[in-house]
């Protein structure tokens, strides 16, 4: 009889657990705040976006030098991430006084920087910001993609440490 009572208690507990909704906490994977509110937060957000972009560009450079067949998909994914982060960096750095032109040097022909300039890899236009570039490091002209990205991005680029903005369109 005690065994039967124990089974009923366990069954009722399990039933009550199943009936309750299960909730999960979202844990952000990026250290970049989504909507910085203060000047300090904007500066930190801008700096973090540029640092994370640098790490992705390093990974992209390593993948582009790897000739294995599996690296192609990874390069494609990394290029999309780099372009998305360039957009984030351009948006979060706007008005902070940060100079984003060193990102051109950081990419060194592997990717490009600048809102409104299309990125290209293996002859296919890519969405996002960036100067047109192929994985071999040869810049490509992407004027038609540039116009599309300027409208899509709608952001400005930061001028030299003055805090003034110049339009990317």
From Swiss-Prot:
Residues 119-169 are annotated as: Disordered. Residues 1-19 form the signal peptide. Tetradecapeptide repeats lie at residues 114-127, 128-141. Keywords: Repeat, Signal. Transmembrane segments: none annotated. It comes from Antheraea polyphemus. Residues 142-152 have a biased composition (Polar residues). This is Chorion protein E1. It comes from the Eukaryota. This protein is one of two components of the prominent 'filler' that helps mold the shape of aeropyle crowns. The lineage of its organism: Eukaryota, Metazoa, Ecdysozoa, Arthropoda, Hexapoda.
């Amino acid at each position: 009889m005690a065994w039967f009572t124990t089974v009923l208690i366990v069954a009722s507990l399990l039933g009550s657990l199943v009936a309750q909704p299960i909730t999960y906490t979202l844990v952000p994977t990026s250290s970049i705040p989504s909507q910085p509110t203060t000047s300090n937060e904007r500066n930190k957000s801008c700096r973090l976006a540029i640092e994370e972009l640098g790490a992705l560009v390093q990974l992209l450079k390593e993948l582009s030098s790897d000739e294995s067949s599996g690296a192609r998909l990874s390069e494609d994914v990394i290029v999309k991430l780099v372009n998305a982060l360039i957009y984030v960096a351009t948006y979060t750095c706007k008005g902070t006084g940060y100079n984003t032109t060193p990102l051109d040097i950081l990419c060194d022909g592997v990717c490009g920087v600048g809102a409104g300039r299309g990125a290209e890899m293996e002859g296919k236009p890519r969405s996002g910001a960036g100067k047109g570039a192929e994985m071999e490091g040869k810049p490509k002209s992407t004027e038609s993609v540039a116009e599309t990205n300027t409208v899509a991005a709608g952001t400005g680029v930061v001028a030299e440490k003055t805090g003034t903005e110049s339009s990317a369109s």
